[in-house]
């Protein structure tokens, strides 16, 4: 089954072709992402209307490019998957409209995919994928969640942020220290040059039971430290290091608690913040100490992309799910409300190849 995946939930246009007749890395026949960073840089953040208009301009050319790179004719597609939420409503509607129109024209099924389920399942596209049960840390600019995955499609949210997501805290902290947009990656790179321990900030909500997160207070603490400092380049790097250490420590502590709570020893990490080098290293060290395993997708599949949508959509199409003819999106969507997969990779149920 060859599935076209379309991602347009925010400021990146992603397209991919996933082939269920293959497995591991080769199953992803091709994928491409167009980033709108340059478009939004002068505003210091994503402008929803501009994002939607740019998806309109870029989506069809990107589909043609990706099909060409995959060596797949448009009439060879067996299904179309698209991000149906959560995300910016206008941006979502662009992808959904193109996907539903294409599926109708080709007379193939379409399926709307939950954006965060796509992230969660992304590590399963790699060689030697993790098998449920496992705990997933979904950490991005819009979400920070710990999810218990008992089976594919069966999700229980164990904890989530009560305010800012981790990626959002990175971006906002970078902006208030004068770093260019997008700030999160810039701050992480700067932290590599900072002195560990010169600035030590709180590890929010780690001094009490529970698996929820809160990063707004940490952000304020960093702001006060920055305002009272000499604001030199050296101090900026040291504060960046202190902030990153605080976020990473918090995420690691909560992940270990979640593994204990779920009585599980496999951790999956996905989402844009999953590319952070210090977070990856610390989680790998923690997993080794407890004799467990931590799984990441390749960095290109941590940020928003069409590959994760094609893969998640393929699993749900194979399970018999279909979207109706209406173009419907859900800007706010609880992943725990998703129907379980009746069939899917590593689910113990035989998959029907198309």
Curated annotation (Swiss-Prot):
EC nos: 2.3.1.234
Catalytic activity: L-threonylcarbamoyladenylate + adenosine(37) in tRNA = N(6)-L-threonylcarbamoyladenosine(37) in tRNA + AMP + H(+)
Cofactors (names): Fe(2+)
Entry keyword set: Acyltransferase, Cytoplasm, Iron, Metal-binding, Transferase, tRNA processing
Any one GO BP annotation for this protein: tRNA threonylcarbamoyladenosine modification
Manner of cofactor binding, per the entry note: Binds 1 Fe(2+) ion per subunit.
InterPro entries: ATPase_NBD, Gcp-like_dom, KAE1/TsaD, Peptidase_M22_CS, TsaD
Database matches in Gene3D superfamilies: 3.30.420.40
Annotated binding of Fe cation, by residue: 115, 119, 304
Amino-acid positions noted as binding substrate in the UniProt annotation, renumbered to this chain: 138-142, 171, 184, 276
Localization of this protein: Cytoplasm
GO CC entries: cytoplasm
HAMAP family (UniProt xref): TsaD (MF_01445)
PANTHER family, per database record: TRNA N6-ADENOSINE THREONYLCARBAMOYLTRANSFERASE, TRNA N6-ADENOSINE THREONYLCARBAMOYLTRANSFERASE, MITOCHONDRIAL
Family, per entry: Belongs to the KAE1 / TsaD family.
Annotated function: Required for the formation of a threonylcarbamoyl group on adenosine at position 37 (t(6)A37) in tRNAs that read codons beginning with adenine. Is involved in the transfer of the threonylcarbamoyl moiety of threonylcarbamoyl-AMP (TC-AMP) to the N6 group of A37, together with TsaE and TsaB. TsaD likely plays a direct catalytic role in this reaction.
Protein name in UniProt: tRNA N6-adenosine threonylcarbamoyltransferase
């Amino acid at each position: 089954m060859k599935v076209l995946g379309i991602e347009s939930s925010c400021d990146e246009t992603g397209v991919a072709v996933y082939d269920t007749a293959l497995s591991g890395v080769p199953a992803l026949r091709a994928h491409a992402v167009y980033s709108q960073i340059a478009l939004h840089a002068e505003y210091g953040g994503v402008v929803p209307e501009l994002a939607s208009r740019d998806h309109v301009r870029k989506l069809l050319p990107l589909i043609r490019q990706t099909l060409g790179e995959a060596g797949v004719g448009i009439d060879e597609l067996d299904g179309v998957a698209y991000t149906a939420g959560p995300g910016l409503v206008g941006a979502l509607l662009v992808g959904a409209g193109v996907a539903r129109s294409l599926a109708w024209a080709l007379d193939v099924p379409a399926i709307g995919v939950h954006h965060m389920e796509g992230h969660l399942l992304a590590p399963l596209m790699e060689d030697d994928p993790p098998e449920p049960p496992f705990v997933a840390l979904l950490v991005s600019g819009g979400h920070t969640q710990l999810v218990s995955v008992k089976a594919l499609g069966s999700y229980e949210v164990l904890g989530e942020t009560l305010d800012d997501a981790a990626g959002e805290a990175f971006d906002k902290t970078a902006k208030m220290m004068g770093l260019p947009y997008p700030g999160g990656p810039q701050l992480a790179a700067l932290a590599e040059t900072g002195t560990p321990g010169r600035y030590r900030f709180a590890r929010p909500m780690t001094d009490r039971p529970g698996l929820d997160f809160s990063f707004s207070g940490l952000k304020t603490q960093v702001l006060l430290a920055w305002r009272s400092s000499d604001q030199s380049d050296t101090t900026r790097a040291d504060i960046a290091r202190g902030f990153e250490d605080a976020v990473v420590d918090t995420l690691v502590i909560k992940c270990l608690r979640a593994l204990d709570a779920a009585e599980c020893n496999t951790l999956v990490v996905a989402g844009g913040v999953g590319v952070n080098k210090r977070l990856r290293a610390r989680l790998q060290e923690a997993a080794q100490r407890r004799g467990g395993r931590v799984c990441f997708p390749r960095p290109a599949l941590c940020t928003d992309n069409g590959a994760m949508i094609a893969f998640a959509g393929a699993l749900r199409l194979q399970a018999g799910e279909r979207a109706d003819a209406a173009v419907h999106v859900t800007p706010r969507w609880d992943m725990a409300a998703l129907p379980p997969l009746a069939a899917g990779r590593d689910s113990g149920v035989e998959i029907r190849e198309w």
